[in-house]
Regions:
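Well-ordered alpha-helical scaffold segments within catalytic/enzyme domains
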Residues: 28-46, 107, 111-124, 189-200
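Active-site neighborhood of glycoside hydrolase catalytic domains
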Residues: 22-72, 82, 123
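A contiguous, well-structured "functional interface" segment within a domain
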Residues: 177, 184-186, 190-207
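Beta-rich accessory regions
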Residues: 58-60, 124, 200-206
Length: 223
């Protein structure tokens, strides 16, 4: 509907479809709009550039107002058939499986990460971005995985450290997306680089050292 908000059914790298606005796909879209605006200006297509700019401003403002919960950006789940927002306060609400919901996703700012690398600037409120990275460190970083349960792939174990794919400080969904309890280096590096852009050097290096310690050439290959 060209309101600047990524909606509907969104297939993603978690091998599932998210239903409803969420930061992972939302910020990718914001970055794409900013990039498209710059390309349009380079081609002297002022009409398309203006359209991209309008969609970006609308979408970015909406995400900061509706997805940012004071600590990080969350997912507003919609009905897979009607795409109406679900009332999560209703104990009888039927939530589709494999969603994120109020989870704190490790790569919720992946679009912002790429935007910084491409010189596109901030896609959302600067303070919200920094606060979100702090929350990822607060809620997703696990210093010792000895007592961590993971029914999926074990890329971290024992007394090793890392950033969880997602955490639910505000209450976990009954059936989250499949890989929520895992740790994956690519997603961790994404968060760490975001922290570096926000001058959060201590937090970034903590994450990077955890990766390098796990992939030290003896326990796992470093490549």
């Amino acid at each position: 509907n060209q309101d600047g908000v990524m909606e509907g059914s969104q297939h993603n790298t978690m091998d599932v479809n998210y239903f409803g606005p969420n930061p992972q796909m939302g910020f990718w879209y914001m970055g794409a709009l900013k990039a498209a605006e710059k390309m349009a200006l380079a081609m002297k297509d002022k009409t398309f550039a203006k359209k991209c700019n309008t969609l970006f401003r609308q979408g970015s403002t909406w995400m900061d107002a509706n997805l940012f919960n004071g600590e990080y950006y969350e997912h507003k789940i919609t009905d897979p058939e009607t795409f109406e927002y679900l009332d999560m306060r209703n104990p009888d609400v039927k939530v589709p499986p494999f969603q994120l919901g109020k989870g704190c996703l490790v790569d919720q700012l992946v679009g912002q990460y790429m935007a910084h690398i491409c010189g596109l600037g901030y896609l959302g409120d600067k303070e919200h971005i920094r606060t979100t990275l702090g929350s990822i460190m607060k809620y997703n970083y696990v210093k010792d995985f000895s007592r961590h349960f993971n029914n999926m792939r074990s890329y971290v174990m024992g007394d090793e450290s890392g950033l969880l794919m997602a955490s639910w400080p505000k209450g976990r969904l009954e059936v989250p997306f499949p890989y929520f309890a895992e740790v994956m280096t690519g997603f961790e590096y994404c968060a760490a680089v975001g922290m570096i852009y926000e001058s959060m050097e201590k937090e970034a290096l903590t994450c990077i050292r955890a990766i390098r310690d796990r992939h030290d050439g003896a326990k796992r290959i470093p490549f």
